[in-house]
Amino acid sequence: MKPSLSVVLPAKNEQGNIRPLIEEIFSALNQHTTFEIVLTDDGSDDQTGQEAIDTAKRLGCQLKVLRHPYSCGQSTAVHTAIRHADGEYIATLDADGQNDPADVVAMLEKAKQVRNPHVCVAGYRNKRKDTPWVRTQSKIANRVRQFFLDDGVPDSGCGLKVFRRETFLLLPYFDHMHRFLPALIRRMNGEIVIHPVNHRDRGAGVSKYNVWNRLWVGIVDLFGVMWLRRRTRWPVVEVTHNDQ
């Protein structure tokens, strides 16, 4: 039987974080829904993938591990995982342990309550556990993005999101697309729901982001998304008759 939910983890060199994260995912979801974990090992040179396999076997947790031979970036890792996922719904989490899997339960319920099939429940880290410099970078990036896209999302950098797999597969794929999921889903007449989430200190390892790939690279993609939104329009369709 296919799971209702696929928990997607893009991971690069997250040995030491994966074991406790999978344990938390299992604890949070095991009594609430059928689920699988789909991890993309994005060119790690540590034991990230094996740590995930060992932990899932011990727990009896359904797991898929996919591997890129070299690092392709977070968006590609997410895209790879979702293409191989079996769940109707997708929950994306950062693999560093800063997202709290306990938030997924409420976010999934919110997604199921929305009648619009193209829904995205986006996490909002209102009490971030990052350095002041990182928080400043994110605030600038969010304000710039909000000014140009007006997507109604206060925290586009939050990796914790829930949406339908079929919705994601309708989106155009490009590098760094994970930053713009709400804007892309809204473009197809989707509905965005903001959900406050817990944010925690990183357990091990170091962040893969800096001022270059957090802000300036994102600005280039921002103008690409603006162009895409203006060039394409999804019509609102009302079914007036269906014999099926």
Question: Can you describe what each PLM-predicted range is?
Answer:
Residues M1-P132, K139, E166, L170, ...:
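Structured catalytic core of nucleotide-sugar glycosyltransferases
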Residues G60, Q137-K139, R143, F148-L149, ...:
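Long helical/loop segments within the catalytic core of UDP-sugar-dependent glycosyltransferases
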